[in-house]
Amino acid sequence: MIRTIAIAVFSTSFICAVKVAAAAQLTNAPPKNGEVVISWNSRGTLEIANQVTGPWITITNAANPYTNVLTPAPRFFRLNQTVDATTLRKKILCGYQGWFRCPGDGGNQWIHWSRSTSTIASNTLTFEMWPDMSEYTHSYPAAGFSYPGGAQAYLFSSQDQQTVDRHFDWMMDYGIDGIFLSRFVVTVANHPTNVLVNVRNAANRTGRTFALLYDMSGQPTNTLFTQLTSDWRWLVDNLHINDDPRYLHHNGKPVLMIWGFFADRFSTNLAHQIIDFFKTNAAYGVTLIGGGEWWWRTETTAGWSNVFRRFDVYSPWNVGNYSTIGPNKYASTAYWSQDLAAAASAGMLYLPVIYPGFSWDNLMQQPPGTSKIPRLGGDFLWRQFYDAGNLGLDMAFVAMFDEVDEGTAIFKVSNTPPTQAYFVTYEGKPADWYLRLAAEGTKVLTGERPNIATIPISP
């Protein structure tokens, strides 16, 4: 009779109880009969309790940090995968828009689902992928849309805490570190906080990390600096956002991404004014990530070469940038190695943008398939992780978690969307396929699995 039991624990939500039959030592030696050996993901810590309600105690083993042998007693154990929020290193973070609204969520508008705030119809759609709604506890009927079997189709609102909780539960369950929450400068005059509070609550509950990404698109240049800095001051002074234990920090400062540094959008004087404030202000200073043009290194517009080399981290926007290899399109990554060297010579870190594919035909009112950059079953995404791993990069920005508008979402999407309009699907791959691929890519960049050119898991 084999009495030794080996159990691997990979999910925070997984709690198991065992009855250990014999004494065991904290040792790296092979187990003896009657011992229960536990192994777990290196990105987490094992917690153990005598009852399911706790108290939970972290256990360690100096000989082998990711295995342990339990002492005799009924034991409950779980994996605590709280993300280290003190550093950008070994972080793969997703962009998170959080901008979807539905009538009945406290407002009375379709926002980012339809170009008409009062109506949703096949000719008003502004999104490309229908989310898999099977796990949401709060949803809203989309009148006139039904699934292939005839059932009413539903959508979610980012205003609901339950929606954001569901998204963060997926991040926790699949091993995704957290997000950059988009905050659009053009909308922050009155300091909206609802989605930010939802994210903050969910991150603290699940042990994920988050940081803000200010998107400067559309804000008039004469008010850009004031509106941007006033909102950050307000968040620090009133919400104490930088003191949240789940808010991402690096080198002791809160991390902030500011996106929209393109040479044709505003002057270098304004760019330097923004950078000066966020890098030098004693009370409101941050570790500053600049997001903008992917050709930053070779930008020839006067003065911009210096601008692009002043950040703490630079993240080139690569979505839509691809090369054709044979019959297929693949994300352009050949420039990353020179970018990495240029960033290092300027004293900056480099945060590449990785995306799974692209399509925005409904948004742009184009014939179906016009703009599509196919996902190739996940190979389009995986090759970017592979290329980043070959360069020794240990951080990345995945664009995006919930962006169904431009078909770049990695969260759960329906393969059987409503039949009343054109939608992109995961082409038969499971709804969680891209969450799983992002998790495996995370392991590559953090050194937890070998870097190989082909997708290492099966659907």
Question: What residues fall within each predicted segment?
Answer:
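Short, composition-biased motifs enriched in small/polar/acidic residues
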Residues: 5-10, 16-82
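Glycan-processing catalytic domains of CAZymes
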Residues: 82-459
